[in-house]
């Protein structure tokens, strides 16, 4: 085998909008409200191994806007990417799919959500940048806490 075949390889095969839904349960009355809506944003990352070196990474964004207790709109979008990752040490795969890949996908998700919100007749909402490194570390800490809790519960 040549050295070339053992070189670390990272390639984006495809980026696509996998799913999107928009609900406006209180339209058209909600458009007459004068109060500014409160906005809640949730982001989640999932990874699935499709083949030995191929992964689908999914970044899901959910935006809920409410005026008082009434939902103005709720939008959920799933931005996906297929990534070919080869000759990367096993311990580096998880951070790559949990940090680097979502960082690549997020601008597409943000753009699709902003576009859908304005097409729905609402003022644009631009999602802030997300620190996927911090999100990844937070997830690892949660897993460690759950495992510690499960381990101590088993000893009782």
Swiss-Prot record:
Pfam families: SecB. Keywords: Chaperone, Cytoplasm, Protein transport, Translocation, Transport. GO terms for cellular component: cytoplasm. Belongs to the SecB family. It is found in: Cytoplasm. Homotetramer, a dimer of dimers. One homotetramer interacts with 1 SecA dimer. InterPro entries: SecB, SecB-like_sf. HAMAP family: SecB. Its main location: cytoplasm. Signal peptide: none annotated. This is Protein-export protein SecB. GO terms for molecular function: unfolded protein binding. GO terms for biological process: protein folding; protein tetramerization; protein transport. One of the proteins required for the normal export of preproteins out of the cell cytoplasm. It is a molecular chaperone that binds to a subset of precursor proteins, maintaining them in a translocation-competent state. It also specifically binds to its receptor SecA.
